[in-house]
Amino acid sequence: MIAHLIVALLAMPVQSFFFDFGGHQAQQQTQQTTSYEDSVLNSDCKGYVCPYTNECSRGPEECSCPFPRSQLRCVLPNKQVVCISKPATNDKKLNDVYDDTAKGPRARNKGVRDCGWVEAAYKGLV
């Protein structure tokens, strides 16, 4: 009986470590973070603050995508920018095109959801 009690007492720190019964995780979550609104309002940017990256630019058409390694930056006919996931393909040549920041957004491949597909959808052709 006493042996079981000792084992239970020795196991409590391990349980606390894995399951955070001490409530330390909740304390970490209460740290104050700067809101998106505050970061935009307190920006030194004299131009346009891009909504997803908070970078300063001359206008929305210059904003980059938040995840450029996995997204294509498509510019619509009205100059708005839409970020889409790069097409998933096993074709190395196509992957190289989509990984190129200049060629990727201009690629128009039939049957692939790339910037060409986005433009067609914008025009109501899809």
Swiss-Prot record:
The keyword Signal applies. It comes from the Eukaryota. Residues 1-16 form the signal peptide. Coiled coil: none annotated. InterPro entries: LCL2 (IPR034543). Keywords: Signal. Probable component of the endoplasmic reticulum-associated degradation (ERAD) pathway. Belongs to the LCL2 family. This is Long chronological lifespan protein 2. It comes from Eremothecium gossypii (strain ATCC 10895 / CBS 109.51 / FGSC 9923 / NRRL Y-1056) (Yeast). The gene is LCL2.
